[in-house]
Amino acid sequence: MDASVIVVGAGPAGLMLAGELRLGGVDVMVLEQLSQRTGESRGLGFTARTMEVFDQRGILPAFGPVETSTQGHFGGRPVDFGVLEGAHYGVKAVPQSTTESVLEEWALGRGAELLRGHTVRALTDEGDHVVVEVEGPDGPRSLTTRYVVGCDGGRSTVRKAAGFDFPGTSANREMFLADIRGCEITPRPIGETVPLGMVMSAPLGDGVDRIIVCERGAPARRRTGPPPYQEVAAAWQRLTGQDISHGEPVWVSAFGDPARQVSAYRRGRVLLAGDSAHVHLPAGGQGMNVSVQDSVNLGWKLAAVVSGRAPAGLLDTYHEERHPVGRRLLMNTQAQGMLFLSGDEMQPLRDVLSELIRYDEVSRHLAGMVSGLDIRYEVDGGDHPLPGMRMPHQELVRADGKTSTTELLHPARGVLLDIADDADVREAATGWSDRVDIVTASLHDAPPQGPLSEARAVLVRPDGYVAWISPGSRAGLTEALDRWFGPAR
């Protein structure tokens, strides 16, 4: 085998997955078509759940001070993310190019292998391994691996070569994006519906502004390259009245509003993550964030299966958990597209939504959906509200000093948090101690009515989601350990 796992694509999804696999002790090779990183940034920031994920792996400090904004939107209607409870709420502005740089350094620092300038031409699932045909700087070569994961974007070669069904709708609108230097542009950070379409603008720093413009009635077009800047400037002037033709274009692109998702995230030994599995209108900055979270869900499971710590059936839970998340992503981005991009016939609905958002419960629902903080997986954890949800950040005190639930997840292992100092709980988990860290610690400054207020013990998966909780007895603990971490040893 050339590598236990080959990941195709060195964007945020592929690099995050590579790092997760290395944390799980699996050798991984990343194949990237581009010979060097691009400075272009489609994504401009993180949502709250992605910040938590990066913090759980110790990556977040590499992005600088955690300065977040609580101002978000849903279809151009302002939403206050401050109504959410969490370690980090709101949105942190970070260009995608910076995210890729940080994740590449993190993954390579843990031993991942990255081959740039390598294009996948074909692949064959042989049942017990996969053969990948690659064109590289030194010519064609065949690589063998136990599993392949396509993280190669909306036009995924892996998805097509492996025969994944990709139902949904193609783009029916075209939007322009341009990063421009030398123009004074009024900020419209959450977008603005104007008589002829929708416009959005925001400063990126260093004298560069980003604009997005969608002219109503402009059909989707198959382009072989970026649109001419003057075409973008003309559309901007028609919609806003502002002449930006004298600006210096740093980057120009066009995109649409497709809504497609693969029917299955896995076919045999080939899996998909990120835009390879789902494409959608980039509304609310969700695309990169959902992609990273796909990889964090898959990484520990694939590592456990490859290393023999868990049965292959664990991989089925990747589709079971992430496909509904992707489906909901398409639903909410389509709804936002209707609000953003439709004509005056949609104005009554916009006005009603603006009224509803004033209620905290509505804002909390929409903010939770866009941020990813409201995701709950089916983990058979009983009636307690926490199983299946993300583990909240909580300061802890143990015999050797202070720690936190976030810090305990840095190694990407399971964690059994013994809050009540219960020897029976610790004894029950000893057969999994090679895969699960058993930690005795008390809660520090926990809110009296918080989610952990009555917990005696909590089992947390490597991706930070609660698999089991004990308000009283240890019933169900060994079953949860067996389900998520394989048989006792």
Positions of PLM-derived features:
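Helical substrate-recognition/capping region of FAD-dependent monooxygenase/halogenase enzymes
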Residues: 1-4, 8, 24, 33, ...
